[in-house]
């Protein structure tokens, strides 16, 4: 399990399904068994407290995203003074209710993602090997960037302003990191490509990962107008 301390009131963690099983829980427990799901989340809170001294005081706000290989959870302490004065029992009850609501929402999102993964896998198989697809793009120009997390991908999808539609794009994921590759048609002006790259860097970062590396080691999770698909499956994030 990877834990990131965002600030004094917020932590973010990513845990793979293998890690979940190593802790004595199954993937099915997490989504279908209320008691086991709550037990799992409280065990995570104990571990977060030990590593980051993140003591549960009052109600918590949690956000869950399910991925093919694991779960990303953002946990924030409430800053509302009235809610901070809640009793421990009331805070625990509210947290449990939030856990169940978010588990239900996450399960729906996970089902959608799994359907999307299956769809993309079929598309790749029908199109042939990834290396053949790369060679077919020899007359295109490609830029690749790295997103730190899913939230950055979502922000780009909702706030980008494409300069051209003459491109193909792919969203990869490897080791919990997202990579976005854009293949511009050969006749697209270099200035347009440069402007598109500059716009991407408002939300993402340069990377030395190549398309060959991504095709060999990463998983394509979205393709063909990635931003539209992200907006379809995920709501806009708020500050």
Swiss-Prot record:
Pfam hit, one: MecA
Molecular function in Gene Ontology: protein-macromolecule adaptor activity
Chain intervals for the UniProt region annotation (Disordered): 118-137
Residue spans of biased composition, Basic and acidic residues class: 118-128
Family: Belongs to the MecA family.
The protein's assembly and partners: Homodimer.
Domain remark in the UniProt entry: The N-terminal domain probably binds unfolded/aggregated proteins; the C-terminal domain interacts with ClpC.
Function text: Enables the recognition and targeting of unfolded and aggregated proteins to the ClpC protease or to other proteins involved in proteolysis.
NCBIfam families the UniProt entry points to: PRK02315.1-3, PRK02315.1-5
Name of protein: Adapter protein MecA
Gene source species: Staphylococcus aureus (strain Mu50 / ATCC 700699)
High-level lineage: Bacteria, Bacillati, Bacillota, Bacilli, Bacillales
